[in-house]
Amino acid sequence: PETRVKAFVDAHEEWIECALEKARVRRESTIFVTPEEAEVLRSKAKEVLIPRVYELAQQFGFKPCGVTIRHQKTRWGSCSARQTLSLNCQLMLLPEELRDYIIVHELCHLKHLNHGPAFWALVQKCLPNALTLRRELRTYIIQPLDNKHVHEELL
């Protein structure tokens, strides 16, 4: 099954790269993703996001126990009490700097499992432009999987 997924991703790499580039330049967006697109995104996210989590973790001194990639309906990411990060495959449709912001945000939850002042101070220490990135992230909306609506930027 993993070989088939990789072959599928490789066969659609040009489309994936094109979709990613269009998503990077678009700032105000509602993201509609079909189940088929979600599978492509999930595969690409595993290739891109998991290594990035560990790069940023090392850079800022965090040690996550694991990373999972899923299609989440309402969250860009989460961090469990077991020190595992879960990231939404739709992160692949965001600009890289926003993906990094979300990853760092979740990594900071490894030290503070809440959104208290100490948490936000740590996020700000890691990413001095965190407030700007947080505001920009609010212009993006996660949409549930929907067979009827495909975001025109992905076509």
Model-derived segments and their meaning:
Residues 106:
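Walker B catalytic acidic pair
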Residues 1-101, 110-155:
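Active-site-proximal or metal-binding-adjacent scaffold patches in catalytic folds
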